[in-house]
Regions:
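Bulky hydrophobic/aromatic packing residues
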Residues: 1-3, 19, 109
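Bacterial N-terminal signal peptides that target proteins for export
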Residues: 2-13
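An acidic, charge-biased composition feature
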Residues: 21-242
Length: 242
């Protein structure tokens, strides 16, 4: 491998790693009210026409002087998002998951999807009625779950949840890329969770699943993901900014 090839690979690894870290901790504005938003009372006949982006934000308990419990987002993915997606995938045009953890904003796992208000209402109802969600709220492991008001479409454009600093073509096409990454992650969660079928303790189970995800990412992410993403873009060097 030539020095220039090595530099290009190192540059790619650093910039993609930086982007992953930044996107994982980017600010997602939570609902300002201290109480969870309630499901809109309107029926399918009274909801507006059209499609837009919708958020379900799961606020995870994070006591002071304690480590971030990343496995809780993985638990929500496997026990809440996966069954909801399997049931209502026809309502979802495009979607992704998102994580953030900062002391000013808290630890939040988000399910973000593009759908009609009617589809959003069905999905929100399924989340609200999910037994694991109820259990996590009752135990205090989830402090609240915030949802959007389905009577108003506030993010109708496909680029409305992309970073406004990006070029327009990137804003409009990035959701497809991150959906693929999210689907791969969710399927990996399901695969690893199936191997822990004998474990009834969900917290213990998803700690193991998260450890497995970390091992796979660290061992195979460079070639399975970063190398092939670089290949799609013709192995060109990247401009790096911090």
């Amino acid at each position: 491998m030539s020095k220039s090839d090595f530099s290009s690979r190192c540059g790619l690894l650093l910039i993609v790693t930086a982007l992953l870290v930044l996107s994982g901790f980017a600010a997602v504005t939570p609902v300002e009210d201290d109480k969870p938003a309630s499901l809109a009372p309107g029926t399918a006949g009274t909801l507006p026409d059209g499609e837009g982006w919708w958020y379900a934000r799961f606020h995870i308990d994070w006591p002071e002087d304690s480590q971030i419990r990343w496995h809780m987002g993985t638990l929500i993915g496997g026990e809440v998002i996966a069954p909801v997606f399997d049931e209502y995938y026809q309502d979802i045009y495009i979607w992704r998951v998102h994580r953030r953890a900062s002391r000013d904003g808290g630890h939040i796992f988000s399910f973000i999807f593009y759908s009609t208000p009617q589809g959003a209402q069905r999905i929100y109802t399924a989340i609200q009625n999910n037994g694991v969600v109820k259990s996590l709220l009752d135990s205090g492991q989830l402090t609240r779950v915030d949802i959007d008001d389905v009577t108003r479409i506030t993010r109708p454009n496909i680029e409305d949840t992309s970073d406004a600093r990006w070029a327009e073509p990137v804003q409009k096409t990035w959701p497809a890329m991150i959906m693929g990454a999210s689907r791969m992650w969710l399927d990996m969660v399901s695969e690893l969770a199936a191997e822990e079928y004998a474990t009834s303790d969900l917290d213990k189970k998803y700690r193991k699943v998260q450890d497995g995800l970390t091992d796979l990412w660290q061992d195979q992410g460079q070639h399975a993901m970063l190398h092939h993403l670089n290949a799609v873009y013709a192995y060109q060097p990247l401009l790096m900014r911090y």
